[in-house]
From Swiss-Prot:
This is DNA-directed RNA polymerase subunit beta. It catalyses: RNA(n) + a ribonucleoside 5'-triphosphate = RNA(n+1) + diphosphate. It comes from Chlamydia abortus (strain DSM 27085 / S26/3) (Chlamydophila abortus). PROSITE patterns: RNA_POL_BETA. One of its GO terms (molecular function) is DNA binding. It holds the Pfam family RNA_pol_Rpb2_45. The gene is rpoB. The keyword Transferase applies. The lineage of its organism: Bacteria, Pseudomonadati, Chlamydiota, Chlamydiia, Chlamydiales. Keywords: DNA-directed RNA polymerase, Nucleotidyltransferase, Transcription, Transferase. Its EC number is 2.7.7.6.
């Protein structure tokens, strides 16, 4: 069996940890959302289950009718993902939900169809209307609590906090200039401020004494004589002091004690006083108590309501319900587990499961937050403000969560409709069942809208496997609930210390989205709360262990972390007494005894694409960014070639992108051809697994997807082996470009300004040839005027134009086509208005005429040439119009299908019985198995399984069996689950086939009779104007293709394949390309492939040694000879092998010319752009250029007849046809537009005719 070639490396030891599955972020999130494969009663309260439990039960307004949710059930997809792409439909499953309705007539249960829900393919994508889409994860501000500070205009620092819920009103508190704290509810209504103490009272702390007790430590002090005065004067009372007999108040809680007050108290025989420790009259709480206009719970509630809703009558009931609704009703206010976790962590509350389940606000939270705010104000060192750009305060919303939020809004909309229907239902005439009051539209339309229109549901970038992989790992700060591109400042976009190992500092787009769209680092994972974690090795007593700990950004703050490249001895202890480490985002030289953790790998810093750049550490960050982005634009080539100089990530990137086919279990290859590979399982040779290969499919970006087998019959394969290559892969490794022999030198000025000179040899060898596939579609509909028809019989078209069309009017496969050729012939009925008056008259006299159709054929658009590689026809079948022969043929077909279906089911049953036997036969039952509905014991604990018991189990379904968890029963459950899913899938496939035989393609759009898709493949060779690039951001445009004989050559006669400009290196500071050139030359000569991972690559000295070992000049420079003259160039030139990519910006897609075409309606000037068949704008500066040359006639022609002189251009067209050559220009339409504009301003402008 063929294996991936080993790459030579200078790395001392391999990484301790393997990369996680690179698309886990997508798959894991959606799996948790749907919980496919779990029984209804085993489902956790997350995802879709959580939404249903949140919204239901729904009660009618009089509470007589209750609708409860019981469980949901997902069907099986009707078509495979590939078939959905082919048919242009959505890859989805049906969602059926079981409800229980209780009303005055009794209890009724029913399963209600709730529409379809798109499901994820195993590659982490969705197929929506036949196009693969990706839902990008969103980074947003985490719910929870944030403490901030801002500077007042007077120079004071004002502290504030903000409690941000997952859903509901924001609560903000801010100090003002007088050290009073004001509460704001909802940012939008910032002007409505409430004193913090009033708000606390409204929460239920009614008396001043209660409030003081919450904020201060209380001590009792005795008051016996005037000696105690010295201690007590100036202290703050914690409770009211009053004479119980006469109810006379001597001091109020919060008051400052004075000598006079104390004397009065002493005279009244008051012996003890409650004092607030550490309180003084300048303390914010004491100040606010003095300022507070309210003194009781009721007064505070009313004051709160008045400020929140000025103008409305402030009744106690209204006020209480408002505050309850705002913060204490789980349907309106939800912190979410995340918000509660962040809040409890910051304020030091317990972190147990019970505490985290509390999703609404508590009184203690507000008190705790105010205490923390006051600590900040008082300068407590342990209290700190939060950095909103720190990854501890930003979290990721993945696919599952985004769709869960959509489902929530859909069901909330549905809730209102259900309540209305419950109220309007007439019980006297009909019985109420769930199906009558539930409308499935709400949920289905919300999901359709999200997948089709949301900013985060994107058409997948499928240029090559890396583009696909990166798109799934992308993080966006844009989208609903996120940032706005225009308003996002510099700080949000910037690289932050907490990004280390979590978000790649390099890979982000150039332009307006810079820093807002980022990529997940290679080892990063997302935890249950949505925070990004990165792995570290734990260091214990100076020994670096192999234990791995995944840490979020806030936990990492407290750790001292050494670099992965720190020197260790054979006992994994630090060699040096000091090493470079990080603490709280700062790098410093740390004593190794203080180190607590160590990086897992140097590449944990960067994303996968950036990790594919060799010698990244020698490139400037700006160029590395371009290198990362341009690798995603590389076109898969016809002949792939893995890079000589790689980084070791190539194989993993190819595998996780899903481009290659990987063996899922050990076995032996039994059969191979271009379309499939069959492997017999090692442990069970009768079980065969077929791997279907993708052949010449069109990707989203029009490139070609084709898989080629790499194994032969008889090969032994191990799980994880590569058995077939895909697009842009070579023997299981990523192969985006070609290894090219380059010289860095100027050559006759042709490589000025980053231009690239290439040898004609590359064109002859098809080195950079790629295949593009275009899809053209035509539909025949049933129109008001009659049916459209796909036919070869097209009016006014010569026979030679129809030469390649078949009898049915569809082009034959293999035909070469060019612009204007007919692909599918179609005729459409003409409407009466399209006929000339005389024709209408003749038809009125002589009746109908046959030629009342017009040509509406599908033709090849300009700029497309190629070969027709595939044609797909979809059509509906009409039961009534079938002939007897067709009906007989259909019956035979259906009989064969049924026979095949029964066979498949019997094979499946035999396989299942064998598997059950292998697992259970002659084994002892570890526990009893009970029938869920009848409560019968099917298998007693300790029973030895015999054939009879196994057959008994075989007839039961998984839902009905109650099995305690243990190893044997866990395997049994998964076997049962797989078997039931396979049975379901067979049944769905059988029904789909039957439907197809009877009705044709029933899922065509309404009104469509027939649909034809034609695929045209074109071979694109490299040509002048194509964009090329290396992996270091060194991009350029092909400026000249030089005959091989004219290219510079080495002393041994070998010609250089490409010439690059040496001036492109120094100012760009991407020296990685030079090092790659040298190492590539040495490795090519030695016949090896090398890997130079990020920060652990080949040192310069090792490259020199390799060059000398291979007999090459140590400095990598050689003398070259001019191919044109044969003379030697004066100086030596750097030559070597560099990996160059061809990018998807091909000149063939951009070049465009117009002779005639459409004009704009208002200005009558030609439209712009290739898509509109537009013209080239001749603007103000171009006019100046022609004026400078004094070419008046040419100018007049350009500005009038070639542009917007309507009558003039008609005349010139006629004169050209007649062969005359005269220019009579009239008034340009833009002049008329100008006059109309001026008249619109109320100026009476009219052209005057002046006699000559």
């Amino acid at each position: 069996m063929f294996k991936c070639p080993e790459r030579v490396s200078v790395k001392k030891k391999e990484d301790i940890l393997d990369l996680p599955n690179l698309i886990e972020i997508q798959i894991k999130s959606y799996k948790q959302f749907l919980q496919i494969g779990k029984l209804a009663e085993e489902r956790d309260n997350i995802g879709l289950e959580e939404v249903f439990r949140e919204i239901f039960p729904i009660k009618s307004y009089n509470e007589a009718t209750i609708l409860e949710y019981l469980s949901y059930n997902l069907g099986v997809p009707k078509y495979s993902p590939d078939e959905c792409i082919r048919r242009g439909i959505t890859y989805s499953v049906t969602l059926k939900v079981r409800f229980r309705l209780t009303d005055e007539t009794g209890i009724k249960e029913e399963e209600v169809y709730m529409g379809t829900i798109p499901i994820m393919t195993d590659k982490g994508t969705f197929i929506i209307n036949g196009a693969e889409r990706v839902v990008v994860s969103q980074v947003h501000r985490s719910p929870g609590i944030n403490f901030e500070q801002e500077k007042h205009s007077k120079g004071n620092i004002l502290f504030s906090f903000r409690i941000i819920p997952y859903r509901g009103s924001w609560l903000e508190a801010i100090f003002d200039i007088n050290d009073l704290i004001y509460i704001h509810i909802d940012r939008k209504k910032r002007r409505r401020k409430i004193l913090a103490i009033t708000f606390i009272r409204a929460l239920g702390y009614s008396s001043d004494a209660d409030i003081i007790e919450e904020f201060f430590q209380i001590e009792e002090h005795s008051l016996k004589s005037e000696k105690d005065f010295s201690f007590l004067v100036g202290k703050i009372l914690a409770d009211n002091v009053l004479d119980e007999a006469s109810s006379l108040v001597y001091g109020k809680a919060g008051e400052k004690l004075s000598t006079a007050m104390l004397k009065r108290m002493l005279d009244a025989n008051i012996s003890t006083l409650k004092i607030a420790v550490e309180a003084d009259e300048n303390h914010p709480i004491i100040k606010m108590l003095a300022k507070d206009p309210t003194d009781s719970y009721e007064a505070a509630l009313k004051d709160f309501y008045r400020r929140l809703r000025p103008g409305e009558p402030a009744t106690l009931a209204n006020a209480r319900s408002t505050i309850m609704r705002l913060f204490f009703d789980p349907k309106r206010y939800n912190l979410g587990r995340v918000g509660r976790y962040k809040l409890n962590r910051k304020l030091g509350f317990p972190m147990d499961e019970e505490s985290l389940a509390q999703v609404t606000l508590r009184k203690e939270d507000v008190i705790g937050a105010l205490k923390y705010l006051i600590r900040l104000k008082m300068g407590d060192e342990k209290a700190s403000i939060d950095d909103i750009d720190h990854l501890a305060n930003r979290r990721v919303r993945s696919v599952g969560e985004l769709i869960q939020n959509q489902c929530r809004s859909g069901l909330a909309r549905m809730e209102k409709i259900i309540r209305e229907r419950m109220n309007l239902f007439d019980f006297s005439s009909d019985t109420l069942i769930p199906g009558k009051i539930i409308s499935a539209k709400g949920l289905a339309s919300v999901l359709k809208d999200f997948f089709g229109r949301s900013q985060l549901s994107q058409f997948m970038d499928q240029t090559n496997p890396v583009a696909e992989l990166t798109h799934k790992r992308r993080l966006s700060a844009l989208g609903p609930g996120g940032l706005n591109r225009e308003r996002a400042g510099f700080e949000v976009r910037d690289v932050h210390a907490s990004h280390y190992g979590r978000i790649c500092p390099i890979e982000t787009p150039e332009g307006p989205n810079i820093g807002l769209i980022t990529s997940l680092s290679s080892f990063a994972k997302i935890n249950e709360f949505g925070f990004i974690e990165t792995p570290y090795r734990i260091v214990r007593d100076g020994v670096v262990t192999d234990e791995i700990e995944y840490m979020t950004a806030d936990v990492e703050e407290e750790c001292v972390i050494a670099q992965a490249s720190a020197n260790l001895d054979e006992y994994n202890m630090f060699v040096d007494p000091v090493c470079w480490a990080r603490y709280r985002g700062e790098a410093f030289e740390a004593d190794t005894s203080t180190v607590t953790h160590m990086d897992v790998s140097p590449k944990q810093l960067v994303s996968i694409v950036t990790g594919l750049i060799p010698f990244l550490e020698h490139d400037d960050a700006n160029r590395a960014l371009m290198g990362s982005n341009m690798q995603r634009q590389a076109v898969p080539l016809l002949k792939t070639e893995a890079p000589i100089v790689g980084t070791g990530l190539e194989a993993r990137a190819a595998k996780d992108s899903g481009a290659i086919v990987v063996a899922e279990e050990d076995g032996v290859v039994e059969y191979v051809d271009g379309y499939k590979v069959v492997i017999a399982a090692k442990h069970h040779p009768t079980l065969k697994r077929t791997y279907d290969l993708k052949k010449f499919l069109r990707s989203n970006s029009g490139t070609c997807i084709n898989q080629r087998p790499l194994c032969s019959v008889g090969d032994v394969v191990v799980k994880g082996d590569v058995i077939a290559d895909g697009p842009a892969t070579d023997k299981g490794e990523l192969a985006l470009g070609k290894n090219i022999l380059v010289a860095f030198m100027p050559w006759y000025g042709y490589n000025f300004e980053d231009a690239i000179i290439i040898s004609e040899k590359l064109i002859k060898q098809d080195a950079y040839t790629s295949i593009y596939i275009e899809e053209f579609e035509l539909t025949a509909r049933d129109t008001k005027l009659g049916k459209e028809e796909i036919t070869r019989d097209i009016p006014n078209v010569s026979e030679e134009v129809l030469a390649n069309l078949g009898e049915d009017g569809i082009i034959r496969i293999g035909a070469e086509v060019k612009p204007g050729d007919i692909l599918v012939g179609k005729i459409t009925p003409k409407s009466e208005t399209e006929l000339a008056p005389e024709e209408r008259l003749l038809r009125a006299i002589f009746g109908e005429k046959a030629a009342d159709v017009k040509d509406a054929s599908l033709t090849v658009p300009p700029g497309t040439e190629g070969v027709v590689m595939d044609v797909k026809v979809f059509s509906r079948k009409d039961r009534l119009s079938k002939s007897d022969d067709e009906l007989v043929e259909e019956a035979v077909h259906l009989k064969d299908l049924q026979k095949g279906y029964k066979n498949q089911i019997s094979v499946l049953k035999i396989e299942y019985r064998e598997k059950l036997g292998a697992l259970l036969l002659n084994e002892k039952a570890p526990a009893s198995i009970i029938h869920r509905r009848t409560a019968d014991i099917l298998v007693q604990e300790g029973t030895v399984f015999d054939q009879e018991t196994i057959e008994l189990l075989e007839q039961e379904s998984l839902v009905d069996l109650l099995m305690p968890p243990c190893d044997m029963y866990d395997v049994l459950k998964s076997l049962l689950s797989d078997y039931e899913t396979s049975l379901q899938r067979l049944e769905v496939n059988y029904k789909t086939e039957v439907e197809h035989i009877r009705e044709g393609d029933a899922d065509l759009d309404h009104g469509v009779i027939r649909q034809v898709k034609v695929y045209v493949a074109s071979k694109r060779k490299l040509q002048v104007g194509d964009k090329m690039a290396g992996r270091h951001g060194n991009k350029g445009v092909v400026s000249k293709i030089v005959p091989e004989a004219d290219m510079p050559y080495l002393a041994n006669g070998e010609t250089v394949q490409m010439i690059l400009n040496p001036l492109g290196v120094p100012s760009r500071m991407n020296l990685g390309q030079v090092l790659e050139t040298h190492l590539g030359y040495a490795a090519k000569t030695a016949g090896i492939h090398v890997k130079t991972p990020v920060f652990e690559g080949f040192p310069e000295s090792r490259i020199w040694d390799m060059m000398i070992e291979q007999g090459l000049p140590a400095d990598g420079k050689s003398y070259l000879y001019d191919g044109k003259t044969g003379e030697r160039f004066d100086n030596t030139v750097v030559i070597g092998y560099i990996y160059m990519l061809k990018l998807s910006h091909l000149i063939a897609d951009k070049i465009h010319a117009r002779s005639i075409g459409p004009y704009s309606l208002v200005t009558q000037q030609p439209l712009g752009g290739k898509a509109q068949m537009g013209g080239q704008r001749f603007g103000e500066m171009e006019v100046w250029a022609l004026e400078a040359y004094g070419v008046a006639h040419m100018l007049q022609e350009i500005l009038t007849v070639k542009s917007d002189d309507v009558t003039g251009r008609t005349r010139i067209y006629e004169s050209i046809v007649k062969g005359e050559n005269l220019l009579k220009s009239g008034t340009p339409e833009s002049f008329n537009v100008l006059i109309k504009e001026m008249q619109g301003l109320g100026l009476d402008v009219r052209p005057m005719v002046v006699d000559a």
